Amino acid sequence: MVALRLIPCLDVAHGRVVKGVNFVNLRDSGDPVELACRYSDEGADELVFLDIRASVENRNTLVDLVSRTAKSVKIPFTVGGGIDSVSSINDLLRAGADKVSLNSSAVRNPDLISKSSREFGNQCIVIAIDARRKVNKFGEWEVYVKGGRENTGIDVLSWAKKVEELGAGEILLTSMDGDGTQNGYDLNLTESVANIVDIPVIASGGAGSLEDIFDVFKEGRASAALLASLLHDKKLTLKEIKTFLLEKKLSIRPYE
């Protein structure tokens, strides 16, 4: 059985790690390189580094920061934010990233998914989907882009299936309704996507307790859980989370 993964997320704006609630009201959470090293040392299975201002400000992710961060850790590392071309992906992979995350650019140009998958292998291509529930529509979600600022009107489940067909190797699925709230993952959203694709789904948005993380694996059928404010605020440690999940008999790489 493939081990379930715990993945700290470093949302970066203007060179600093930030975290907000529902994609707004951002607060400073520290230096990205320092936090990357800390989480790597504490037993993270992977890291995700997202330049959350890049797609809004129409600039590329800072390759220098990626390079410094990647050189400081020994675990797989995903980079996202403002990546809109095969050449940009190449630059980031050469700078030390193991994977790249595409979001707005993939919606705007779906061919980028297939082109990059053919060029670098689908194991390198993560598609980030920012999902928000439709008003008064249970079990229906729409895809948002531009850092959650623009509603595309695209159905999340249809888009998830399409990106898999185009060559995505993984889906990073964020519940905008749960982001930063620490009120629990959107299990209905996560399970709905996991049930219609055969590629791993990383659940994001809402982790607030040990039980939340257990539930997203057990009920949500996620392959990985993204963790941000829960760790940044030192509410829980990776060791505590892994110990709890191992006691629950989940397939987790032990804390070392």
UniProtKB/Swiss-Prot annotation:
Pathway: Amino-acid biosynthesis; L-histidine biosynthesis; L-histidine from 5-phospho-alpha-D-ribose 1-diphosphate: step 5/9. InterPro entries: Aldolase_TIM, His_biosynth, HisF, IGPS_HisA/HisF, RibuloseP-bd_barrel. Keywords: Amino-acid biosynthesis, Cytoplasm, Histidine biosynthesis, Lyase. The active site is at 11, 130. Its EC number is 4.3.2.10. It is found in: Cytoplasm. One of its GO terms (molecular function) is lyase activity. It holds the Pfam family His_biosynth. GO terms for biological process: L-histidine biosynthetic process. It catalyses: 5-[(5-phospho-1-deoxy-D-ribulos-1-ylimino)methylamino]-1-(5-phospho-beta-D-ribosyl)imidazole-4-carboxamide + L-glutamine = D-erythro-1-(imidazol-4-yl)glycerol 3-phosphate + 5-amino-1-(5-phospho-beta-D-ribosyl)imidazole-4-carboxamide + L-glutamate + H(+). The keyword Lyase applies. One of its GO terms (cellular component) is cytoplasm. Signal peptide: none annotated. Heterodimer of HisH and HisF. Belongs to the HisA/HisF family. PANTHER family: IMIDAZOLE GLYCEROL PHOSPHATE SYNTHASE HISHF (PTHR21235:SF2), IMIDAZOLE GLYCEROL PHOSPHATE SYNTHASE SUBUNIT HISF/H IGP SYNTHASE SUBUNIT HISF/H (PTHR21235). IGPS catalyzes the conversion of PRFAR and glutamine to IGP, AICAR and glutamate. The HisF subunit catalyzes the cyclization activity that produces IGP and AICAR from PRFAR using the ammonia provided by the HisH subunit. This is Imidazole glycerol phosphate synthase subunit HisF. The gene is hisF.
